Amino acid sequence: MLEQIRGPADLQHLSQSALSELAGEIRQFLIHKVAATGGHLGPNLGVVELTLALHRVFDSPHDPLIFDTGHQAYVHKMLTGRSHEFDSLRKKDGLSGYPSRSESEHDWVESSHASAALSYADGLAKAFELTGHRNRHVVAVVGDGALTGGMCWEALNNIAAARRPVVIVVNDNGRSYAPTIGGFADHLAALRLQPGYERVLEEGRKAVRGLPVIGEFCYQCMHSVKAGIKDALSPQVMFTDLGLKYVGPIDGHDEHAVESALRHARGFNAPVIVHVVTRKGMGYAPAENDEAEQMHACGVIDVATGRATMVAAPGWTSSFSEALIDYGAKRRDIVAITAAMPGPTGLSAFRDRFPDRFFDVGIAEQHAMTSAAGLAMGGLHPVVAIYSTFLNRAFDQLMMDVALHKLPVTLVLDRSGVTGPDGASHNGMWDLSVLGIVPGMRVAAPRDGARLREELGEALDVNDAPTAIRFPKGDVGEDIPAVRRHRGVDVLAEPADGLSDDVLLVAVGPFASMALTVAERLRKQGIGVTVVDPRWVLPVPEVLTEFAAAHKLVVTVEDNGLHGGIGSSVSAALRHAEVDVPCRDVGLPQQFFDHASRGEVLADVGVTDRNISRQITGWVAALGATPADADEVSERLD
């Protein structure tokens, strides 16, 4: 049946039994396809019936469907004609793991940062009103987890202030708060599902208020009693008191019930909350039985067991997790903060070991940062573990609430640099540029697991400024020993005997391994290279300018945007120190990268050992540092 669905129109003629059969097909399709490619399995298994109902009730793309975060949009993609592309999910030039405007007119928003959908919906509804398209509904699907983000409530405050047709579907999978319970609450929900309820209620208001003398008093008394009952028995009051209609709670796996609720909500032609209770991982036992995350995201897995087909090598996140626990055992002042991601950021183990020193603040990065400031003011040392890309959300708080007060808060920036398959919104390629303008900020970029542990300890010893440690996604690799350490900077390689000090190659973090490969390739061409790892990359170590003065060319290699990156900072440091040595930088261009593997993205932008070797050879030849002809040497490097 799924093969016959080319678009939402193909759903309209299906019976309830056919829809039930289709839902089963969709789940099996998802399980087998995502098992082969990796992706967000649990969230999509939980929204099958909901997505079917949305596309039967609303006219996409005429009525925009906006999925908050977007990782639960796989079913939406299937119902809008993209089922045949799922073998390429999250692969280079393939199907994105999130909504994508370049893929389909049905995808309005492609940023996968949480808590933003309601603001998009508010803006679209205003635009439709101003341009005369009053017959268009805007639908935002937001999870209960995303509602922990303050931006949602800012948007709700605005949406509730006008009678624009915005339908907000709260996909409540029970992960953040319990569904409404109790007979009277069920009665209220049933009343709200009756087509004539709102009309009858309005007529009742008019009749009571029309009573001579006592009408308004009676109405206020009745309203207060009703409000008091709601406050006591139902969480819907948080929405209705804002002036929003409320429909629910609805069994999110009963397609007919969800569809009925959505049709009634559509008929209000005003802002309305539809509360849908779903189960993450629905229909796949390994996901339903995964108590920690219900298979929120997975790699390639065995369908029968739900287990990964390959044993993962030690990763950066686990290395950080182990180190933090060790430091936490020695120091009771260390506390940990996450913004709704204890597992992915490596804090689950710290939470289990030191539950009283762990704080999950929900999807609230701004609050996390300022709360950390308060903890530091109180004599503790907070460690805020966050994805690099989400740091952007809390920049003002970092600058004004933490750095201005010179507070000892340590940021641990996971998924820095190119992350790959999750696409543009998840690449952490701006953190060095952002952090570089924060006064007093100190940033470390460990090259391996041993340095991660060491630099974390050094950060925790800082008591008068914020610090940050950045590392990428993936395997941590083998430790890379230093030849020597000079005033805090590790020397990883020096020119071989007989070669001059031609190039100082400054490697940022894990790019140290690539830098050593480049140095070896250049050695074979008679070019002497010193490879250094600054360890603490911001501010630029003063000794680095002394290293530079002894060489003919400085080259920086970093997993960050070139604008405002370490290369820019090193160039500025050389100018300020009046060291007249040319500096070239290798890094990421200022653009949004499509989803692909990390290696594929880096290759596309020329950040490979082969290409860097070729570039340096040309730069050295242009300086006259060696007699070799640049083109001739480049050919030999190939």
Swiss-Prot record:
Q: Which UniProt keywords apply?
A: Isoprene biosynthesis, Magnesium, Metal-binding, Thiamine biosynthesis, Thiamine pyrophosphate, Transferase
Which cofactors, by name? Mg(2+); thiamine diphosphate
- The answer to keyword Cell division applying to this record is no
Where along this sequence does the record place binding of Mg(2+)?
Answer: 144, 173
Instruction: State which Enzyme Commission number(s) the record gives.
Output: 2.2.1.7
A Gene Ontology molecular-function term? Answer: thiamine pyrophosphate binding
Keyword Acetylation assigned to the entry: answer is no
A single GO cellular-component term from the record reads: cytosol
Residues that, per the record, bind thiamine diphosphate: 71, 112-114, 145-146, 173, 284, 365
* Catalytic reaction equation(s): D-glyceraldehyde 3-phosphate + pyruvate + H(+) = 1-deoxy-D-xylulose 5-phosphate + CO2
Record's function text? Catalyzes the acyloin condensation reaction between C atoms 2 and 3 of pyruvate and glyceraldehyde 3-phosphate to yield 1-deoxy-D-xylulose-5-phosphate (DXP).
What is the protein's name according to its record?
1-deoxy-D-xylulose-5-phosphate synthase
Native species: Mycobacterium sp. (strain JLS)
Q: What is the lineage of its organism?
A: Bacteria, Bacillati, Actinomycetota, Actinomycetes, Mycobacteriales
